[in-house]
């Protein structure tokens, strides 16, 4: 039988399926449940220095099988999040702490605190497309990205993942600026908009949001392929993964693991068990013994 476990920056995962940072992992009990129902690891909601309410409703628009969201980085603040991590850790699987800030100093404070809370790795949200002063505004500046990653790597011992944006002119330049990160997370959501044709106005209270789900999968596949080919660094693929075939595409493009978000919102928390046996069946039929044998095979041809 094929081995569907994988290793990411030295972290052993029982399968390649992780929970993406987003709207379904706000508290410890939800994260624990997702892990107990088959997720190999979970990435927390992005956490900042202080509590943030986010945007007023509406903050989510269904767009076919995809979503446009502008939640606004709502979170309880780092000082109030430790207990949620403690609860999630009861599942005995890796927890990745996602953090956002506007400069290297704050990113570092958050990362150090996450490490103190016992996370297994840190994911730097350098790419949220809809909050002024954070995310994309930080992640589109290669000098700032380099400063942030380098400073954090000098202060923490756990692996650091840099989540990069598709909403930049040269993602390779940004990836190289973050080269000291232990892995890249590709991609964050695509900046998007929806109009209500009857009210003649944007649907989201923030006007713009981030598009996620199947609509962005080809974009994510492209960037994983290009960044893996250019850098050779470990990559976590994210964007539009709804089934095992989507996950395999990302893996063959160069990802060592994948993250799932919108599909959980659409299809429920049971998706992981189904994808596990489907992946194992595919690997048996195609005679792949290990996940690593599939990583980047499309690049090698």
Curated annotation (Swiss-Prot):
Its EC number is 1.3.1.14. One of its GO terms (cellular component) is cytoplasm. Pathway: Pyrimidine metabolism; UMP biosynthesis via de novo pathway; orotate from (S)-dihydroorotate (NAD(+) route): step 1/1. One of its GO terms (biological process) is thymine catabolic process. Keywords: Cytoplasm, Flavoprotein, FMN, NAD, Oxidoreductase, Pyrimidine biosynthesis. It catalyses: (S)-dihydroorotate + NAD(+) = orotate + NADH + H(+). Substrate binds at residues 45, 69-73, 125, 188-189. CDD domains: DHOD_1B_like. FMN binds at residues 21, 45-46, 125, 163, 187, 213, 239-240, 261-262. The active site is at residue 128. It is found in: Cytoplasm. Its main location: cytoplasm. Its cofactor is FMN. Belongs to the dihydroorotate dehydrogenase family. Type 1 subfamily. NCBIfam families: PRK07259.1 (NF005574), pyrD_sub1_fam (TIGR01037). HAMAP family: DHO_dh_type1. This is Dihydroorotate dehydrogenase B (NAD(+)), catalytic subunit. It comes from Thermoplasma volcanium (strain ATCC 51530 / DSM 4299 / JCM 9571 / NBRC 15438 / GSS1).
């Amino acid at each position: 039988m094929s081995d569907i476990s994988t290793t990411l920056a030295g972290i052993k995962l029982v399968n390649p399926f992780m929970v993406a940072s987003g709207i379904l992992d706000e508290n410890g009990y939800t994260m624990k449940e997702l892990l107990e129902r088959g997720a190999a690891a979970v990435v927390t909601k992005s956490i900042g220095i202080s509590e943030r309410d986010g945007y007023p409703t509406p903050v989510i628009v269904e767009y076919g099988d995809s979503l446009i969201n502008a939640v606004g980085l709502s979170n309880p603040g780092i000082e109030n999040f430790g207990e949620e991590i403690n609860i999630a850790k009861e599942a005995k699987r890796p927890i990745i702490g996602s953090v956002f800030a506007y400069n290297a100093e704050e990113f570092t404070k958050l990362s150090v605190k996450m490490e103190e809370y016992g996370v297994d790795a840190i994911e730097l949200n350098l790419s949220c497309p809809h909050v002024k002063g954070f995310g994309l505004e930080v992640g589109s500046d290669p000098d700032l990205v380099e400063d942030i990653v380098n400073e954090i790597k000098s202060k923490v011992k756990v692996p650091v993942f840099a989540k990069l944006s598709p909403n930049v002119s040269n993602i390779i330049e940004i990836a190289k600026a973050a080269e000291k990160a232990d892995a890249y997370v590709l991609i964050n959501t695509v900046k998007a908009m929806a109009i209500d044709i009857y009210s003649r106005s944007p649907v989201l209270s923030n006007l713009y949001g981030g598009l996620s789900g199947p609509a962005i999968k080809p974009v994510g596949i492209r960037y994983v392929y290009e960044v893996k080919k250019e850098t050779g660094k470990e990559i976590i693929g994210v964007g539009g993964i709804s089934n095992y075939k989507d996950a395999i595409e990302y893996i063959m493009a160069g990802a060592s693991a994948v993250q799932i978000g919108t599909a959980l919102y659409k299809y429920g928390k049971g998706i992981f068990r189904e994808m596990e046996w489907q992946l194992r069946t595919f690997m048996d039929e195609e005679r792949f013994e290990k996940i690593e044998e599939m990583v980047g095979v499309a690049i090698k041809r």
